[in-house]
Amino acid sequence: MKQTIILLYGGRSAEREVSVLSAESVMRAVNYDRFTVKTFFISQSGDFIKTQEFSHAPGQEDRLMTNETIDWDKKVAPSAIYEEGAVVFPVLHGPMGEDGSVQGFLEVLKMPYVGCNILSSSLAMDKITTKRVLESAGIAQVPYVAIVEGDDVTAKIAEVEEKLAYPVFTKPSNMGSSVGISKSENQEELRQALKLAFRYDSRVLVEQGVNAREIEVGLLGNYDVKSTLPGEVVKDVAFYDYDAKYIDNKITMDIPAKISDDVVAVMRQNAETAFRAIGGLGLSRCDFFYTDKGEIFLNELNTMPGFTQWSMYPLLWDNMGISYPELIERLVDLAKESFDKREAHLI
């Protein structure tokens, strides 16, 4: 009997378009000799829509439902996704997706799911909290200032200018895919950047800009996590924002990255240490800055990285000899392993 994969996609965050791309890639790559795929779309308003089922490979003309093509007659209760023995693959990015909320819902339903658990998902989603945890693990990061809604913005800007030097990067603390990120060269630009970031979150991070290459490492596993050789993001834009990643196609990837073996070893070790520090499970992508001075800074951990067939994370594992379809199978098996362990602890 085939294993059912419940594919959750869409979502309420600004990254819902990325989720659709990732989900369509997964549905086309699944090994249909082993799996059946059932898809549920989460609308921008948070409603669950039962969409398609696939027992064999979809045709090129098959497309998943989006906010523009919703069939509201197929709206269901969120709990309708439950199916005994099924594994959920929540291809959801950003808040209300990879921040622990969906993970908690799936644990209430007693369903295995791909990826990090409630704690590690919510922790890694918040950039400020992640930085504090990684500091305790002894992992180097770029200097930063945290700003929370209600703070005296003028005083915080003064703190930024005392501790950091322009240019700086301003980021919503609880957002991914470079949504809401701005580069500032002066105080006026910083004020505008803060306004933009606060549109997406009530906690904002201001980081020191560094002249650095962007290097990424893939992680796969539960308590026995393994890492990939690093890949490099090669940009034709000022910084790696949402449009550059997913809309304008202004980036290329160099896999494996052209860096020394010593640097590779440090990055892989730091990535695995960071994954363990947050209690990661299943998968993550760890992003580093490698400066022209030879400094290695961990930038962020992404617990549900972009998962299209052309995204960095699957390509990193492909370089290690694990194909995209095989990667999906391994993640499903890891999900069942972590579920069994979680259930065994409930005594």
From Swiss-Prot:
GO terms for molecular function: ATP binding; D-alanine-D-alanine ligase activity; metal ion binding. Residues 131-333 form the ATP-grasp domain. Transmembrane segments: none annotated. It is found in: Cytoplasm. Its main location: cytoplasm. It holds the Pfam family Dala_Dala_lig_N. ATP binds at residues 161-216. Keywords: ATP-binding, Cell shape, Cell wall biogenesis/degradation, Cytoplasm, Ligase, Magnesium, Manganese, Metal-binding, Nucleotide-binding, Peptidoglycan synthesis. One of its GO terms (cellular component) is cytosol. Mg(2+) 1 binds at D287, E300. InterPro entries: ATP-grasp, ATP_grasp_subdomain_1, D-Ala_lig_Van_CS, D_ala_D_ala, Dala_Dala_lig_C, Dala_Dala_lig_N, PreATP-grasp_dom_sf. Mg(2+) 2 binds at E300, N302. Its EC number is 6.3.2.4. GO terms for biological process: cell wall organization; peptidoglycan biosynthetic process; regulation of cell shape. Pathway: Cell wall biogenesis; peptidoglycan biosynthesis. Binds 2 magnesium or manganese ions per subunit. It catalyses: 2 D-alanine + ATP = D-alanyl-D-alanine + ADP + phosphate + H(+). Disulfide bonds: none annotated. SUPFAM superfamilies: Glutathione synthetase ATP-binding domain-like (SSF56059), PreATP-grasp domain (SSF52440). Its cofactor is Mg(2+); Mn(2+). Belongs to the D-alanine--D-alanine ligase family. NCBIfam families: D_ala_D_alaTIGR, PRK01966.1-4, PRK01966.1-5. Cell wall formation. This is D-alanine--D-alanine ligase. The lineage of its organism: Bacteria, Bacillati, Bacillota, Bacilli, Lactobacillales.
